[in-house]
Amino acid sequence: MGGGDGGAGKAKARPVFSSFMTVFMHADAADVALMVLGLLGAMGDGISTPVMLLITSRIFNDLGSGADIVKEFSSKVNVNARNLVFLAAASWVMAFLEGYCWARTAERQASRMRARYLRAVLRQDVEYFDLKKGSTAEVITSVSNDSLVVQDVLSEKVPNFVMNAAMFAGSYAVGFALLWRLTLVALPSVVLLIIPGFMYGRILVGLARRIREQYTRPGAIAEQAVSSARTVYSFVAERTTMAQFSAALEESARLGLKQGLAKGIAVGSNGITFAIWAFNVWYGSRLVMYHGYQGGTVFAVSAAIVVGGLALGSGLSNVKYFSEASSAAERILEVIRRVPKIDSESDTGEELANVTGEVEFRNVEFCYPSRPESPIFVSFNLRVPAGRTVALVGGSGSGKSTVIALLERFYDPSAGEVMVDGVDIRRLRLKWLRAQMGLVSQEPALFATSIRENILFGKEEATAEEVVAAAKAANAHNFISQLPQGYDTQVGERGVQMSGGQKQRIAIARAILKSPKILLLDEATSALDTESERVVQEALDLASMGRTTIVIAHRLSTIRNADIIAVMQSGEVKELGPHDELIANDNGLYSSLVRLQQTRDSNEIDEIGVTGSTSAVGQSSSHSMSRRFSAASRSSSARSLGDARDDDNTEKPKLPVPSFRRLLMLNAPEWKQALMGSFSAVVFGGIQPAYAYAMGSMISVYFLTDHAEIKDKTRTYALIFVGLAVLSFLINIGQHYNFGAMGEYLTKRIREQMLAKILTFEIGWFDRDENSSGAICSQLAKDANVVRSLVGDRMALVIQTISAVLIACTMGLVIAWRLALVMIAVQPLIIVCFYARRVLLKSMSKKSIHAQAESSKLAAEAVSNLRTITAFSSQERILRLFEQSQDGPRKESIRQSWFAGLGLGTSMSLMTCTWALDFWYGGRLMAEHHISAKELFQTFMILVSTGRVIADAGSMTTDLAKGADAVASVFAVLDRETEIDPDNPQGYKPEKLKGEVDIRGVDFAYPSRPDVIIFKGFTLSIQPGKSTALVGQSGSGKSTIIGLIERFYDPIRGSVKIDGRDIKAYNLRALRRHIGLVSQEPTLFAGTIRENIVYGTETASEAEIEDAARSANAHDFISNLKDGYDTWCGERGVQLSGGQKQRIAIARAILKNPAILLLDEATSALDSQSEKVVQEALDRVMIGRTSVVVAHRLSTIQNCDLITVLEKGTVVEKGTHASLMAKGLSGTYFSLVNLQQGGNQQVQH
C-alpha cells in the first residue's frame, strides 16, 4: 500500500481504504481465520520469487565464471539446482493456502452479503421504490452483478495484491542484501513502474462506473419488453422497442471506446520497464568494471528491482478492482444502512394489550412522494367503529386505496393522524401493527413457490390443519385438492399458473390465516367471475364477522350489507351512512352511483356489482383452467412426467462449444480494426523474445574482461532496450483501442440481435420457467459483457501469445537446440497445470451461475411484490427461501476452493522445478563444452520469459472458460427457430381487413402444459363488423380464443382463418397491425403517457393522439395532470390508478384504428363511474368493427350483436341477449344472468 499512499497523498488514500473495508463487512470469525491463513499463503507465495532470484544469481555466477574445473563446477550448479527444488516444495504449500482459503471465504462472504442486501431491500418503505430509485432491474443487478464483483475481488484480486506486495518487499530486500549501490540508484525507477498503473486505475474506475450506470437504461427497456411480450407483439412494437434499445446502447459503446484507449495508454506505459533495464544495464556494467561485482549478481539485482517494481505495479493494478468492489459493496451497504422513514424492522413503539379495531383518520393531509404537487387528501376525516364494516366507494383516483396504504403505513401522512383504538399508529410497533391487519388487494401477489408456502405467508408457524381451514374459509380448498400436487403445486412466477379467481382465493386464505383484527379488502373480488365471486364473497362475509373491515369496491352490490358506506370524491368523504339511508336521498352521490350501475333492463340493482368482478377472472379464467394445472403440470411434469425435464434436455446438451469463427463473423464489419489490432498484437508478441535475447546477451557481456568491449556492447544493448520501450508504447495503444472497438460494437450487436431474436419467439417460449424476464435480462446483461472481454482482451492476448511463443521457440532452437528442446519439452507441464485448473473452474462456473439465476429470480419477485411482503411482514420468510436457493452454490464453492488451491499450488511449484532442471542440464552441457555461457543465458532468458507469457495467458483461460459458456448461450438464443414466425416475408400483408374470423375444428392445449386440453374440435365464426361477446365460467376458454386470434399460440389441429385465409398464411406483424387488444391488466411501459398511447404506431399527429384519448375518455384526466401528456408513467405504470391505466390502454388500441378489436375484460377493473365512461368509449369504438368481447359482467355485453356462451371449451348457446333470455330457465345464459342478479336480490332481503 505504501507506494500507493505516497503517490496519491494520504488524504486521498484514506477514503479508498476505508471504503474498501466495506468489502469485508460481511466476514465472521471463520472467515477471519481463513483470511489470515490465506494472507500467510499469499505472502509466502510472493516471497518465493525473490528467493528464486537469489539462488539464480549464484548459479549465473558459477556458469559465467566458466567451467575451469569441471567437477567442482558441476557440484556447485547441482547444489543450487537442489535448493530450487526445496523452494518449489515450500511454494506449493503457500500457494495452496492462498488459493483455497480465499476462494472459500469469498463465497461465504458474498452469499452472506446477498442475503443481507435482500433483507435490506425488503425492509425499505414503499416510497423508496416509488421514487424510481430502486426499479426491479437495479435490485437484480445488485444481487447478481455487485455480489459477483465482490466475490471475484475476494477470491482473486486480494490474494493477488498481497502476493505482489510481498514480492515487492522481498525483491528489494534481496537487492539491498546483494548489491545496495545498484538497488539504491534504481529505487526511484519504482515510481515510474507504478504511476502508469495507478493513473490507469483511476481513469478506468470512473469509466467503469459510467458504463455500468449507462447499461441500466437499456436493461430496463429489455426487462419491460420481455415481461410484457404479449403487449409488445399485439401492438407490433418490436421495432419501436429495438430502436429505443439501440439508442440506449449507443452511449455505452462510446464510453467503451474511451476505455479501450485508456487501457492502451496504460498497458503501453509499461514499456517503461525496458527503459529502466537500459539504465540498470549501463550502471551495472560500471559496477562490474570498477567495483568488481560479479555479473550474475548484477543481473539478479537488476531483475529483482524490475520484478519488485512490476509486482508493486500489478499489485496496485488490483486497486482498480478494489475500487469497483468497494463501490459495489458501498452500493449494497448504502441500502443495508438506509433506515427507511417507516422502518418495518424497528422494534420501538408500543403494542396494545387488546385491540378492538377502531380506526380513525383525523385531518389527514397526504400526497404521494412521487407526485408531491398533486395532494390526495387535504383534510381527510373518517371513523370506522370497532367490529364494523365500512365500505369506501367513489370514482377512480378519489383516494380509496390511499386510505388502505396509510393504514398499513406504506406511507405516513404529511399532517394529521391515523389512529387505531385511539392511538396514533406511528407510536405503535410496526410489525405488530401490520400483524393486526389482513390485506387482500386487487392484483394478488403470489410468489414462485408452492401454494402452501404462499398461504403460510400469513402466519409462519401455522399447522397444516390451520392452512387447510384457511383455504376452506377462502373457498380455495376444493380447487387446490383437485390439483395433481395439491397444496404443493408450484404457483409459477408472479402466480402465472393460476387463474385470477384462484390467485385471489389463495390471497384471501393467506389473509384469513393471519386472523387479523382489521381486514382490508381492496377490490378483493373484482377479479372473479360470478360463481367464484359469490363463494369468495361469502368467505369474506364470514371472515369479516366481528372484525373491523374496510372494503373498497366498485361493484356496489357487494357492499350493501356494509354497516357504513363512505362515498369519496377527490379525497373527501362526501356522504356517510348505511345503504338504505344513502339510497333514500335521490340526489345524493351514492344513489346516482347505484343508478349508474343498474342493468339496462333495470332488472335489479347492480348486477354489475356482482358481476363486475367476475369479470376479471374471465380473462384469467381461460388461462385459468388451462393455467390451473399449469402449475401443477409444470412441476409434475418436471418431476414425474419429465416433460419439462425433457425440454431442458433437448436444450441443454445442444449447447455445443460455439466456433470462435462464428463470433468473429459477427465482428466482420470491424475488419479494419481487427487487422490493425491483430498486427499490433503480433508485433507486441515479438517484443518479449527480442528483449529476452538482448537481456541474455547482456549477462555474458558482464563476464568479459576487456573494458572497451564491455562499454561498446553495453551501449548497443541499452539503445535496443530504449527502442523497445517506445515501440511497446505505440503498439499497445493500437492494439487495445482497436480490440476495444471490436468488443464494444460486438457487445452492442449481440445485445441487439439477442433482443430482436427473443422478440420473435412465440409466447409459449416466455411461458417456460427458465425464460422468466429476470433470467433473460441478466443473460442480456452478463453474457454480452463476457463476450466483449472475450474478443476485446482475450483475443488480443491469444494472438500476442502465439506470436511470442513461435518467435521464442525458433530463436531458442537456433541458438542452442539441445537446451531449447529440454526447456520446450517441460513447458507443457506448466501449461497442463493451468489447463487443469481452467477445466475445473469451467465446470464450476456453470453450476454457480445457474444457482445465481435462481436467487436473482427470487429477488426480482420479492421486489415486485414488495407491498404484499410488507403488509404480511414476511421478509423473514422470503429470506429463508433465498437462503435455500443459496445452498447449491455453497456446496459447489467448497469443491471449487479445493481445486483452486491444488491448481495454484501445483502450477507455482512446477515452475520453480523446471528452472532447477534447466540449470542442471545447462550446466552439464557447458561442462561438456556443447554450449557457451552466452548461449545458455540467451536461450534461458528467451524461453523462461516466454514461459511466463504462456503462464499469464493460461491464467486468462479461466475467463475463456466463462466466455465459452456465455458465447454458447448467446448462440443458443440466436439459433433458436421460433415456432411462430412473426415476420414471414412470403406471408400475405393485408392493406385492410373486413375482419371475418373463422375458427374451425381446433384442438388446443397450452404448450407449457400439453396434458390439459382446452379445446377439442372447437368451431366458432365471428361475423365481420359485428360485435361478438364470449361469456362463460372461468376456464371455459374465452381468453384462449383471443390468444388464437392474435396468434400468440397455434392450435394443435384445425385452423383459424381471418377473411377466409388461414392465419398462418399472413405475415403476422402485418396482420397484428389490424388487430387491437385491450386486456384486463393493462401493460403500460416506463415512459410518458404520450409515448404509451403512440406505442407501436410510429407516426401519429398530436391531434390524432388527443382524439384517441378523448374517445377513450382519458383526455380530461390527462389534461388535469401537471405535465399533461408528458406525465411519466413509472415502471409498469405504477403512478396511475387502474381506471386511468385502462383508459390509456384503450386509447392506445383506438389510435391503431384496428379492423378487429379484442376486449379481454377491458372494464373489469374499473369502478362504476370510470366503467360507465369507458364502456361508452368502447361502444363508440366498436361501431363498424369486428369486436370480440370477453366479459363477466353481463350487463356490459347486452348490446352485442351475438353472444356466445362457452362451457369447458365448447359453445353451448349463441344468440342475441333477448333471444337467449327468452329461453328461460333451460338456457345457460339465462341462468348466468340470473346468478348475477340473484346476487342482488339476496342482498336486498
From Swiss-Prot:
Q: Which domain of life is it from?
A: Eukaryota
Kindly list the places in or outside the cell where this protein is found, as annotated in its UniProt entry. Answer: Membrane
| Low complexity bias spans | 620-641
Per the annotation, which location comes first and is thus the protein's main one?
membrane
Q: Where is this region: Disordered?
A: 610-654
Q: Where does ATP 2 bind?
A: 1032-1039
Please list the residues that bind ATP 1. Answer: 394-401
Q: Where is the ABC transporter domain?
A: 359-595, 999-1233
Name it. Answer: Putative multidrug resistance protein
